[in-house]
Amino acid sequence: MARSYELTRTTGETDISLRLNLDGEGKADIETGVPFMEHMLDLFAKHGQFDLFVKASGDIEVDAHHTTEDLGICIGQAVKEALGTKEGIKRYGNAFVPMDETLAQVVVDLSNRPHLEFRADFPSQKVGTFDTELVHEFFWKLALEARMNLHIIVHYGHNTHHIIEAIFKACARALDEATAIDPRIKGILSTKGLL
């Protein structure tokens, strides 16, 4: 059974069409009008081995806030829907990713209990034209809509681009681990019987 989901979301601020395949090959085709997010989502797909296709337009003449936030919403919804009943998944994922002087860790629990613990500081407020505070907005919406417990910890680093890139790569790897099917797991990995 294919674990993929396709959606379109249109608001007064953004118009997003998206397709996500959890069991992909790391293929990506991303058009958002926000070059830095395109770079990060391309990395996210490659390092998570997800196939991710996104076409988004938004009010980027104002700033990238709405587009970045709504991308988190849409990718989160796609993850949740692609997982279906969550039968057989590992549920938990943990990844450390170094990027030169930076070390980032991301831990995921696909628990149906949304929470974001975000322990990252960015030395610069911008990377190019991209506002770095939007990284938190993206991951909060991702966690909320995917209904996952997401912990992001940057152990150290001083280059803002490296810090953000390490976070996205670590999130991809942790999510790949958490969504992986383990044939030893019968049903859902919870004593409650559901997630």
From Swiss-Prot:
One of its GO terms (molecular function) is imidazoleglycerol-phosphate dehydratase activity. InterPro entries: IGPD_sf (IPR038494), ImidazoleglycerolP_deHydtase (IPR000807), ImidazoleglycerP_deHydtase_CS (IPR020565), Ribosomal_Su5_D2-typ_SF (IPR020568). It catalyses: D-erythro-1-(imidazol-4-yl)glycerol 3-phosphate = 3-(imidazol-4-yl)-2-oxopropyl phosphate + H2O. It is found in: Cytoplasm. Its EC number is 4.2.1.19. One of its GO terms (biological process) is L-histidine biosynthetic process. This is Imidazoleglycerol-phosphate dehydratase. Pathway: Amino-acid biosynthesis; L-histidine biosynthesis; L-histidine from 5-phospho-alpha-D-ribose 1-diphosphate: step 6/9. It comes from Shouchella clausii (strain KSM-K16). Keywords: Amino-acid biosynthesis, Cytoplasm, Histidine biosynthesis, Lyase. Belongs to the imidazoleglycerol-phosphate dehydratase family. It is an enzyme of class 4 (lyase). PANTHER family: IMIDAZOLEGLYCEROL-PHOSPHATE DEHYDRATASE, IMIDAZOLEGLYCEROL-PHOSPHATE DEHYDRATASE HIS7. The keyword Protease does not apply. CDD domains: IGPD. It comes from the Bacteria. GO terms for cellular component: cytoplasm. PROSITE patterns: IGP_DEHYDRATASE_1 (PS00954), IGP_DEHYDRATASE_2 (PS00955).
